[in-house]
């Protein structure tokens, strides 16, 4: 009895060590790169302002109700708590997502282990997940976007769904209802896209008739509707145009690309299939055909296999029918990882020799992908074409450059395809140093202006019209300059890094 207990302790200790090692790509040097464009940049400003105003219902941008990103503020609440603990830093914005991603790994492991009673199968699912760029890359596990929390909530919902299918206790209906409420407060209707696959799984597992005849399903549904409606009506009280913004920014018009607020270029229905194969799932996608072949060999679709297959494929098809961004398919990564892991388990149950033969290439791919993920985390850097997007952010992130800024400093960007990923840093400087820096245009320039820019086109244009004195410089074309008349003589000596 004692030896069995000691063996179990050692096995779980091994699992814990492996999980810590697998989590490294999710948190190593997570604060080195500046705040990223789009959702993270928007969320960072929302969180900074909420930490000041304590307006917990309405997300604001420049202290006005945010209508560009009208998602509820669950993630922002966590980021505000993180700011209170860690200050206005990149780590504060990203730490909640890192925690959610690590928790997702444990939920995924727990779900697969519950299905198989095999720890190594659960570890394979986690290995596939954390080494996929679609999980640890930008807009996902390491960054302050909504995807990390959404993935955790989807996995939590699926865990409760599976437990309910095995043991239809009413508490699981309320757990699933609570998760849906949190999911809506995280990223609007995104979590509801998992429901069609869940219904199909319950039908296949013959749990559907009992579900619809259970009054607690309707009580749980009512709970969801009341809590979600309470938030949306409460926010509408303070932001009267909020429901209009939600309709066009989050619901059907956005999905069908008929929104009056957002417009997306047309992308093929097969876009996500290509992205999974070429970018986010990469080598692991080679194993996906085997997940279809294995149940064919067994001449049986097990409930466990069908659980992952139907939830993953249904979500993929729904997402493929709507507007698209690379990071929208981040929740697909753990679902397909679970599908591959369960397929290996099914093969193991049929033939241990075949399963261990397949295990060898999995370990080879796993080592290769882990090395890539670990390297990306250990040496985070900008791509060559990103310096003209994040140059100002790097400049403002580094305290060594801040002493050269003044109330006369203005930011000048090119007149086309220019983004303001640096707004979080401007607000941080304003709060900490009382220094307000605004953006200007070419038409507003005056002799004596101090200009901060990161576009080569801007620097070249300034040199044509002014004598440009470089006070400070950073990566590539990021320069802090003073404009002088062409007739003036300056000492042009950049302080290059």
Where are these regions (language model features)?
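Extracytosolic helix-loop segments that constitute the early lumenal/periplasmic catalytic or substrate-binding loops
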Residues: 24-29, 43-67, 74-77, 81, ...
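Short periplasmic/luminal acceptor-recognition loop of GT-C membrane glycosyltransferases, typified by
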Residues: 368, 372-488, 493
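Short hydrophobic alpha-helices at membrane interfaces in multi-pass membrane enzymes
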Residues: 120, 160-181, 309-312
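Transmembrane-helix signature of polytopic, membrane-embedded enzymes
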Residues: 12-17, 108-131
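Transmembrane-helix motifs of polytopic, lipid-linked glycan transferases
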Residues: 95-116, 156
């Amino acid at each position: 009895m004692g030896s069995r207990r000691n063996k179990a302790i050692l096995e779980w200790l091994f699992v814990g060590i492996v999980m810590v090692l697998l989590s490294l790509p999710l948190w190593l040097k997570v604060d080195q790169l500046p705040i990223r464009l789009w959702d993270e940049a928007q969320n960072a400003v929302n969180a900074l302002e909420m930490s000041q105003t304590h307006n917990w219902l309405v997300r604001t941008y420049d202290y006005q109700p945010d209508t560009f990103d009208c998602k509820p503020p669950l993630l922002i609440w966590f980021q505000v708590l993180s700011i209170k603990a860690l200050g206005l830093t990149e780590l504060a914005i990203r730490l909640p997502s890192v925690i959610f991603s690590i928790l997702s790994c444990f939920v995924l492991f727990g779900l697969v282990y519950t299905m198989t009673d095999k720890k190594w199968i659960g570890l394979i699912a986690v290995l596939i997940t954390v080494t996929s760029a679609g999980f640890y890359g930008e807009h996902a596990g390491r960054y302050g976007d909504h995807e990390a929390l959404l993935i955790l909530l989807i996995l939590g919902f699926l865990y409760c769904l599976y437990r309910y299918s095995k043991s239809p206790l009413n508490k699981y209906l309320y757990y699933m209802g609570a998760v849906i409420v949190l999911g809506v407060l995280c990223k609007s209707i995104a979590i509801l896209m998992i429901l069609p696959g869940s219904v199909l799984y319950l039908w296949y597992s013959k749990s559907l008739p009992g579900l619809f005849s259970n009054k607690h399903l309707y009580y749980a549904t009512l709970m969801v509707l009341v809590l979600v409606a309470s938030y949306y009506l409460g926010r509408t009280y303070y932001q009267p145009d909020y429901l209009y913004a939600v309709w066009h920014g989050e619901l059907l018009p956005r999905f069908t690309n008929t929104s009056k607020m957002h417009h997306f270029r047309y992308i093929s229905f097969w876009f996500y299939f290509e992205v999974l194969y070429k970018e986010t799932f990469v080598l692991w996608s080679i194993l996906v055909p085997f997940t279809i072949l294995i149940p064919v060999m067994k001449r049986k679709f097990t409930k466990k296999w069908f659980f992952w297959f139907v939830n993953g494929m249904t979500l993929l098809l729904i997402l493929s029918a709507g507007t698209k961004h690379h990071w929208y398919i981040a929740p697909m990564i753990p679902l397909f990882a679970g599908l591959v892991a369960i397929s290996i388990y099914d093969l193991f149950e049929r033939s241990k020799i075949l399963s261990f033969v397949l295990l060898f290439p999995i370990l080879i791919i796993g080592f290769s992908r882990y090395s890539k993920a670990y390297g990306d985390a250990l040496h985070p850097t900008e791509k060559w074409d990103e310096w003209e997007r994040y140059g100002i952010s790097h400049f403002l992130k580094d305290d060594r450059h801040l002493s050269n800024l003044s109330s006369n400093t203005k930011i000048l960007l090119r007149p086309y395809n220019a983004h303001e990923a640096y707004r979080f840093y401007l607000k941080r400087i304003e709060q900490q140093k009382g220094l307000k820096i605004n953006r200007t245009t070419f038409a507003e320039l005056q002799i004596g202006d101090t200009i901060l820019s990161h576009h080569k086109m801007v620097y070249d244009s300034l040199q044509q019209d002014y004598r440009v004195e470089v006070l400070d410089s950073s990566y590539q074309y990021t320069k802090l300059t003073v404009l002088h008349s062409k007739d003036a003589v300056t000492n042009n000596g950049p302080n290059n890094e």
